């Protein structure tokens, strides 16, 4: 039996949608999310002061995204409504990053399967716990796939390269300034210039803050952290002991000449 003219198999449709979404996401600049000494850090190059890639969802939960702003903004607002309703009807502690990740996975999966155009987004939902072992970082892709990340995650354009550079500097329990320095090192291409503080969007989920854990870092506070992280990086790059200068060997030197 011959296929009708213009027929596209479901498998090919899914591949085409996935390629389309990946290309759209890759055009955006990367965002990194990583654990630090007292919580979870979010860092994104973002020259816009009005359009945020990083936001608060609920008391202990943060949100970061790359891709089309109008699409991930719709997801963010939907997540806030979900959190507010569940926190009001039940208890605030019942609102979790896992629940939000499941909600987003269902929405993204349905859109990817049923719509002609998939969402060109990749998002992270993170929740800070009472200790680092209780922190949760979930990454969701355009088709609704969910990944439970540990320690760090990079998404957006050149995500693999950014994640590789971040792993070079990352370790458990980094102080905030050093974690920020590691994030900026990862987000800066080799030989490239770092984004100035005015073009960075930085926020934390700080487990030591009462009630709402989300805090944006900007202005003088961000400048101080950047200076501290840069100074720490320069100090660690300096060898602890200077190498001893080369000295001539003791005794007579054979020059290769006779006499």
From Swiss-Prot:
Pathway stated in the Swiss-Prot or TrEMBL entry: Protein degradation; proteasomal Pup-dependent pathway
Entry keyword annotation includes Ribonucleoprotein: no
Regulation: The formation of the proteasomal ATPase ARC-20S proteasome complex, likely via the docking of the C-termini of ARC into the intersubunit pockets in the alpha-rings, may trigger opening of the gate for substrate entry. Interconversion between the open-gate and close-gate conformations leads to a dynamic regulation of the 20S proteasome proteolysis activity.
Main location class: cytoplasm
Subcellular location: Cytoplasm
Gene Ontology molecular-function annotations: threonine-type endopeptidase activity
One GO location term (cellular component): proteasome core complex, alpha-subunit complex
GO terms under biological process: modification-dependent protein catabolic process; proteasomal protein catabolic process
CDD domains for the chain: proteasome_protease_HslV
Disordered: annotated segments: 226-259
Low complexity composition-biased segments: 227-250
UniProt keyword terms in alphabetical order: Cytoplasm, Proteasome
Superkingdom per UniProt: Bacteria
Function noted in UniProt: Component of the proteasome core, a large protease complex with broad specificity involved in protein degradation.
Family named by the database record: Belongs to the peptidase T1A family.
Known partners and oligomeric status: The 20S proteasome core is composed of 14 alpha and 14 beta subunits that assemble into four stacked heptameric rings, resulting in a barrel-shaped structure. The two inner rings, each composed of seven catalytic beta subunits, are sandwiched by two outer rings, each composed of seven alpha subunits. The catalytic chamber with the active sites is on the inside of the barrel. Has a gated structure, the ends of the cylinder being occluded by the N-termini of the alpha-subunits. Is capped by the proteasome-associated ATPase, ARC.
The protein's name in its UniProt record: Proteasome subunit alpha
């Amino acid at each position: 039996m011959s296929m009708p003219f213009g027929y596209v198999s479901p498998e090919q449709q899914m591949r085409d949608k996935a390629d389309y979404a990946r290309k759209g996401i890759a055009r955006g600049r990367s965002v990194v999310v990583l654990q630090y000494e007292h919580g979870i850090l979010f860092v994104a190059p973002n020259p816009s002061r009005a359009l945020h890639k990083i936001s608060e969802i609920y008391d202990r939960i943060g949100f970061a995204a790359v891709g089309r702003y109008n699409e991930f903004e719709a997801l963010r607002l939907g997540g806030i409504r979900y959190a507010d309703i569940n926190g009001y009807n039940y208890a605030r502690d019942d609102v979790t990053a896992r629940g939000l990740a499941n909600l987003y996975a269902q929405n993204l999966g349905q859109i990817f399967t049923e719509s002609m155009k998939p969402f060109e987004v990749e998002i992270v939902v993170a929740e800070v716990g009472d200790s680092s072992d209780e922190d949760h970082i979930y990454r969701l892709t355009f088709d609704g796939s969910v990944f439970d990340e540990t320690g760090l995650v990079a998404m957006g354009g050149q995500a693999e390269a950014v994640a590789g550079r971040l792993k070079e500097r990352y370790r458990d329990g980094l102080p905030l300034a050093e974690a920020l320095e590691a994030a900026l090192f990862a987000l800066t291409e080799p030989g490239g210039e770092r984004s100035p503080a005015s073009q960075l969007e930085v926020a934390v989920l700080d487990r030591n803050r009462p009630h709402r854990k989300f805090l944006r870092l900007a202005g003088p506070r961000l400048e101080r952290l950047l200076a501290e992280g840069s100074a720490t990086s320069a100090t660690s790059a300096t060898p602890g002991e200077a190498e001893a200068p080369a000295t001539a060997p003791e005794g007579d030197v054979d020059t290769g000449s006779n006499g």
